[in-house]
């Protein structure tokens, strides 16, 4: 995957992936974050899919400034490249960044991930 422009046009490790919600697939772009325990998406995706995201398992994640952010976890099928698998995806109305976050749980234990910053490439090897 090639890095994508984010805030102010700066290239970041943002990748496309498919997420299945209620038997329908959605294309989502997410920032690959090796410091995030869980994947956390903005709730607009859940609302579009008519998923009551607050029905998920609630947990609180500590963000960079020490504040606890409520996250509602759902086990969803995703497609990353050619691989399809189920992993925990959280939704939070308090996500304080402008992009979805792809975290470690269910992702980093499945792939060898290489960030090639100088070339703007991120690779996933299963």
Q: Where are the regions that the model predicts?
A:
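Pepsin/retropepsin-fold aspartyl endopeptidases
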Residues: 1-126
């Amino acid at each position: 995957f090639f890095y994508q422009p984010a805030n102010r046009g700066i290239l970041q490790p943002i990748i496309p992936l498919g997420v299945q919600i209620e038997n329908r697939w959605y294309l989502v772009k997410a920032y690959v974050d090796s410091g995030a325990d869980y994947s956390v998406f903005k709730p607009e995706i859940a609302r579009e899919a008519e998923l009551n995201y607050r029905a998920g398992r609630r947990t609180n994640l500590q963000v960079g400034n020490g504040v606890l952010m409520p996250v509602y976890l759902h086990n969803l099928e995703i497609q990353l490249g050619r691989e399809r698998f189920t992993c925990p995806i959280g939704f939070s109305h308090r996500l304080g960044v402008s992009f979805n976050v792809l975290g470690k749980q269910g992702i980093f234990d499945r792939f060898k991930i290489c960030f090639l910053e100088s070339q703007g490439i991120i690779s996933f090897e299963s």
